[in-house]
């Protein structure tokens, strides 16, 4: 998700991702999706990890649009797509300013943060959280910005 620096209740951003859909007759295929989206929590969005500051939103969008979807490659999935997109952003000098795009760090922090939120009952309704907001971790500041 690419969103504004300062969020308001009705802020929107753009969601970029590789999505798997069933094929008529069996099997599935991957396709790229770009959607304007709310920044509010959804059932498909567990956590957000802020990895960089956008310098040129158009350039970020072009990189996302041009990150390939790899049909028929065993083991390839949306996580592999994110990894490749971040690697492309990392070597580009126009899209992002300050950023942390080292895949092993981003992946490990995201997994650990999601587990921490699960342990705190963020997703099962037992905790005391504002469920309208997605829990967010700022990797640049190394701190949680939305619980």
Give the residues covered by each predicted segment.
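Non-catalytic ligand/cofactor/substrate-binding and regulatory segments of enzyme domains
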Residues: 1-76
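Activation targets extended, charge/polar-rich intrinsically disordered C-terminal tails
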Residues: 65-147
């Amino acid at each position: 998700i690419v969103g504004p620096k300062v969020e308001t209740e009705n802020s929107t951003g753009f969601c970029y991702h590789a999505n798997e859909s069933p094929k008529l007759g069996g099997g599935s295929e991957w396709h790229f999706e770009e959607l304007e989206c709310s920044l509010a929590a959804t059932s498909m969005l567990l956590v957000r990890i802020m990895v960089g500051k956008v310098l040129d939103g158009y350039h970020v969008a072009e990189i996302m649009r041009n990150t390939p979807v790899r049909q028929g490659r065993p083991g390839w999935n949306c996580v592999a797509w994110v990894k490749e997109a971040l690697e492309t952003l990392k070597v580009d000098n126009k899209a992002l300013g300050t950023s942390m795009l080292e895949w092993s760090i981003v992946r490990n922090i995201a997994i650990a943060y999601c587990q921490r939120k699960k342990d705190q009952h963020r997703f099962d309704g037992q905790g005391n959280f504002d469920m309208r907001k997605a829990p967010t971790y700022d990797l640049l500041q190394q701190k949680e910005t939305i619980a």
